[in-house]
Amino acid sequence: PADQRLVDITQECMYKGMALVKPGAQLGDIGHVIQQHAESNYYTVVREYCGHGIGKGFHEEPQVMHYGRPGTGMALKEGMCFTIEPMINQGKPQSKLLGDQWTVITKDRKLSAQWEHTCLVTKDGIEVLTRRKEEVFPWEQ
C-alpha cells in the first residue's frame, strides 16, 4: 500500500545518498540525489531537520541536508563520520514540533518516513557503522 511505498522510497533515498560517500564527494551531491529520488516519486523532503556529524559530541557539524545542488557543500574527507537520515513526506515538506518538544508531525498531517545510518568515510568509500547483520546494500549486489 501507499504507506509501505513511502517507507521503501525513503530507504532508497538513504541508500542513494550513501552510495555517493567517498573522499572528494560533496554534501550537495548527497542531498541532491536524495531530493531527486523523493521528488521523482512524488514525495517531498523535510528541510527543518538533517543529518549531522558525529565526533566527541553526538550532533556536530557538518549538517547533512537531504536536498541540494550537486557540486556544492563541504567535500568529504577520509575519517569524517556523519549520519544520512532523510525524512520523506507524502504531502508538503513542512513539519511542526508538538508541545512535548520532541514529537514532530507534518503540518498537513500526511505520513512521513525516516531511515538513518551512520557513515564513516574511508579511503575506498564508506563504512556503515550502524549496518544490520542481514543488511545488503544496493551497491554490493
Which ranges hold each PLM region?
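Active-site neighborhoods and metal-handling regions in enzymes and metal-associated proteins
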Residues: P1-Q141
